[in-house]
């Protein structure tokens, strides 16, 4: 990035970085057509992804790439720190569409170590408009305060909060009516909690006990059609 005081250089830089995307797009199209001439015809015909991926907006964690999947194979929702508030219209709309219309078989909540959103939530300071969003993660800390405070190493505590934030987001997904009702009727979707490691590119499966969590949640949040 040029010196901001050199406006002409900044303008040229912005034009170049913008135009580069279209060059890359044309190269990508050529590559896809070369491998499969019908790729875009099939893409335009519709989507039937097996997976709903709920992840962090961090640019280093591209959902399709880390899962080894192509366009049309995963439905994606991303936000800061992969939080799933049940009052967030965006998250709830995505889950309802993915489960109710696309009939996804798996819902993955994927966090990542060294998450800036989780790190910010660990900082006891006023972060303005981010405060209500980060409150969700701070509440995760509050719920698991005893476990987290017992971890002496700051890095290990940070990593564990990343994992617990994923687990609590999975709980939020499981609380939704559309997930409970679809699972009762069809046996899917299954909810999974993963963490991506930026240092080696590997995914860690937290192996959440989906049936156990569902049974525990339904003691209070039983939203299946036969529960009334």
Swiss-Prot record:
Induction of expression: Down-regulated when grown with elevated levels of potassium chloride.
Pfam family, one: Pro_CA
Biological processes, Gene Ontology terms: carbon utilization; cellular response to carbon dioxide; cellular response to oxidative stress
Record InterPro entries: Carbonic_anhydrase, Carbonic_anhydrase_CS, Carbonic_anhydrase_sf
Keyword check for Acyltransferase: no
Catalytic activity: hydrogencarbonate + H(+) = CO2 + H2O
Alphabetized UniProt keyword annotations: Lyase, Metal-binding, Stress response, Zinc
Any GO MF annotation of the entry: zinc ion binding
Entry GO terms, CC: cytoplasm
E.C. designation(s): 4.2.1.1
Superkingdom: Eukaryota
Family: Belongs to the beta-class carbonic anhydrase family.
Biological role stated in the UniProt entry: Catalyzes the reversible hydration of CO(2) to H(2)CO(3). The main role may be to provide inorganic carbon for the bicarbonate-dependent carboxylation reactions catalyzed by pyruvate carboxylase, acetyl-CoA carboxylase and carbamoyl-phosphate synthetase. Involved in osmoadaptation.
Record protein name field: Carbonic anhydrase
């Amino acid at each position: 990035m040029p010196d901001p005081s050199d406006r002409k250089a900044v303008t040229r830089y912005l034009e170049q970085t913008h135009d580069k995307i279209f060059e890359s797009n044309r190269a990508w199209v050529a590559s896809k057509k070369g491998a499969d001439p019908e790729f875009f015809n099939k893409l335009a015909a519709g989507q039937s992804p097996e997976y709903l991926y709920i992840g962090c907006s961090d640019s280093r964690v591209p959902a399709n790439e880390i899962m080894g999947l192509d366009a049309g194979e995963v439905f994606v929702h991303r936000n800061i720190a992969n939080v799933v508030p049940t009052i967030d219209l965006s998250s709830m709309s995505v889950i309802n569409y993915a489960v109710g219309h696309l009939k996804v078989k798996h819902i993955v909540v994927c966090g990542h170590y060294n998450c800036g959103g989780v790190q910010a939530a660990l900082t006891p300071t006023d972060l303005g408009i981010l405060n209500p969003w980060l409150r969700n993660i701070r509440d995760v800390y509050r719920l698991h305060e005893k476990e987290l405070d017992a971890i002496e190493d700051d890095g290990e505590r940070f990593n564990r909060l990343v994992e617990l934030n994923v687990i609590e987001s999975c709980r939020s997904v499981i609380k939704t009516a559309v997930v409970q009702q679809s699972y009762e009727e069809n046996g899917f979707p299954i909810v999974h909690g993963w963490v991506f490691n930026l240092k080696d590119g590997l995914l860690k499966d937290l192996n959440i006990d989906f049936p156990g969590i569902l049974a525990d949640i339904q003691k209070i949040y039983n939203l299946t059609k036969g529960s009334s």
